[in-house]
């Protein structure tokens, strides 16, 4: 439960409307009582999302920097990953209907205790903990509550000083969050001591390049004559959250832990655009399991002629694996077949019930009903269709044609 003191401070912060004087790029820092540093961002100058976010330490600051990335070439999955890469504690102001049942109960109890009524646009404070690749969650950790309280107190001091000074006079600077100083506030008794803090250098993104440890399977792949086509590959963050508790039927507001967004590895046939395989994994701590999944797929579908990638993370993942498989790894600026497959996946999960549009299913079944197409399908596509047959997902007439062609090729 959020302490009532935080509600008091949040409502006081809302009254001073600091977002009318500071832009979201004009950060200030707070030296917390536990010795850590929080980087504070005031949002709302455009009137769309009024909030105060506290980013803990350099890791938090690095996630804040990502919020300012504006790349028109990012696809829906890239944008989603940026949006959910934040590491911060936030109080924002919402309509009552935007709060969940737990939050409504808490704010109602607070108002009853304080004999208050909240009125006006976006009058209700919402307290959230954002962690990278996780669903925004309730503010329950004592350290997070402390950091937000001290940031709100510092923000009120900033607002008071801006009554008689400009942001520039107080040391606020504009621009990208690199190579500049920002105000640092540190409590001394009942007041804050102000100084300047140099922003630390940004972190460089690093990605892991795992090896396949299963020597026996590598030997089997090396001896196999089964070949596949060119693979377009991408690792990206799923747009749908996952939770073991959700799978058991729990309501999201009642979960003990925040749902997380898993990663997906998508493999697409570069020639046909057919999705050959899709593996899901929770984090990059699961890379051994992902390598094993890749090995199983290569054994099933055949070794590709080449692996095509278009981003640093996927390139790093396949760097050693491609070498072990004896396959050329090629970096391309664009992979149209992969982009189309990812767009289709995004549209599928954007539907309210999570079911692919009926017209897409009908078009696929109509295509597979034509016997003439099977002789031109790559082996890996037939292998994938056979999995659908085994799962009972395809009509009998299509299943017979798939099995007949697989038998003809000795798959």
Question: In which residue ranges do the predicted regions lie?
Answer:
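Secondary-structure boundary/capping micro-motif
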Residues: 1-411
């Amino acid at each position: 439960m959020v302490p009532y003191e935080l509600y008091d401070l949040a409502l006081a912060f809302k009254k001073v409307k600091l977002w009318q004087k500071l832009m979201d790029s004009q950060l200030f820092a707070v030296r917390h009582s536990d010795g850590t540093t929080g980087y504070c961002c005031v949002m709302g100058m455009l009137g769309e999302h009024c909030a105060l976010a506290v980013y803990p330490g350099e890791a938090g600051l690095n996630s804040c920097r990502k919020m300012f990335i504006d790349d028109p070439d990012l696809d829906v999955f890239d944008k989603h990953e940026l949006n959910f890469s934040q590491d911060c504690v936030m109080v924002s102001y919402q309509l009552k209907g935007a709060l969940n049942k737990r939050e409504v109960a808490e704010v109602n109890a607070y108002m009853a205790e304080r004999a208050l009524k909240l009125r006006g646009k976006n009058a209700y404070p919402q307290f959230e903990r954002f962690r990278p690749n996780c669903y925004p969650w309730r503010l329950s950790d004592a350290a997070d509550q402390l950091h937000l309280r001290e940031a709100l107190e510092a923000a009120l001091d900033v607002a008071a000083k801006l009554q008689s000074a400009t942001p520039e006079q107080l040391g606020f600077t504009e621009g990208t969050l690199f190579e500049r100083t920002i105000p640092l506030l540190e409590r001394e008794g009942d007041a804050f001591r102000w100084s300047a803090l140099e922003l630390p250098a940004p972190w460089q993104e690093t990605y892991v390049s795992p090896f396949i440890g299963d020597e026996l399977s590598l030997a089997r792949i090396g001896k196999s004559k089964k070949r596949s086509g060119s693979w377009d590959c991408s690792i990206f963050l799923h747009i749908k959250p996952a939770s073991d508790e959700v799978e058991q039927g729990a309501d999201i507001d009642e979960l003990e832990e925040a749902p997380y967004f898993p990663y997906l590895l998508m493999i697409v046939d570069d020639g046909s655009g057919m999705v050959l395989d899709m593996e899901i994994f929770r984090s990059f701590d699961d890379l051994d399991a992902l390598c094993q999944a890749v090995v199983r797929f290569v054994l099933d579908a055949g070794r590709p002629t080449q692996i095509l990638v278009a981003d640093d993370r996927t390139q790093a993942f396949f760097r050693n694996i491609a070498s072990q498989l004896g396959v050329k790894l090629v970096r391309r600026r664009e992979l149209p077949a992969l982009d189309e497959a990812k767009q289709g996946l995004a549209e599928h999960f954007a539907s309210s019930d999570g079911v692919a549009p009926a017209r897409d299913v009908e078009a696929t079944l109509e295509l597979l009903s034509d016997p003439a197409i099977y002789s031109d399908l790559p082996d890996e596509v037939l292998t994938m269709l056979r999995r659908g047959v085994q799962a009972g997902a395809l009509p009998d007439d299509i299943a017979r044609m798939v099995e007949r062609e697989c038998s003809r090729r000795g798959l």
